[in-house]
């Protein structure tokens, strides 16, 4: 039983690289479990024994079930959150460096331990707004492969790095997206 539960949790985590993916995955799980989706902008007709959920902004979800015995008034409430420390890509996403490299213009979100993001392959996932006709629609995206890296500087460029580094998110934590184009003689054969 525990192995199956652990497998389900790991599967959920794998399918949920962002809070938007987590909400979409939870909504699908609730629908499969017989929950009815409600829209916030409509009046709700709730019934005894009904199971319901609603989402807001694609980033939050509330689910509830109504008991059959409504004479016994009580609530059991459990809550959690699906967002976590992350970097959000800004609207003007590309920052080009002097050497032709490209960094992503990001903003840190949440209480993060900055050093843990350094020197490890990272991917990109989340929500984008796409124009379809005369309207914009929300789409989930996940590249599911390593695309960016937030590099530490070499020790000879910052001898005090091991004495406590104070990171500037807008300078030190911008993900490197591309090393730029190589000229014909920029590599060894």
Can you describe what each PLM-predicted range is?
Residues 1-189:
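N-terminal hydrophobic/helix-forming segments and targeting peptides
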């Amino acid at each position: 039983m525990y192995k199956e539960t652990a497998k389900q949790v790991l599967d959920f985590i794998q399918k949920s690289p962002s809070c938007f993916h987590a909400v979409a995955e939870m909504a699908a799980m609730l629908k499969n479990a017989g929950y009815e989706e409600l829209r916030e902008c409509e009046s709700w007709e709730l019934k005894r024994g009904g199971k319901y959920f609603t989402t807001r902004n694609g980033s939050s979800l509330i689910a509830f079930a109504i008991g059959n015995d409504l004479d016994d008034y009580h609530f059991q409430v459990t809550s959690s959150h699906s967002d976590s420390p992350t970097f959000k890509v800004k609207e003007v996403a590309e920052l080009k460096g002097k050497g032709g490299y490209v960094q992503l213009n990001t903003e840190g979100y949440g209480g993060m331990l900055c050093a843990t993001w350094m020197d490890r392959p990272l991917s990109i996932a989340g929500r984008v707004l796409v124009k379809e006709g005369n309207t914009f629609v929300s789409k989930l995206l996940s590249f599911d492969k390593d695309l960016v890296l937030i590099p530490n500087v070499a020790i000879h460029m910052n001898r005090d790095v091991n004495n406590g580094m104070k990171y500037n998110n807008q300078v030190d934590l911008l993900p490197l997206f591309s090393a730029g184009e190589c000229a014909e003689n920029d590599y060894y054969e």
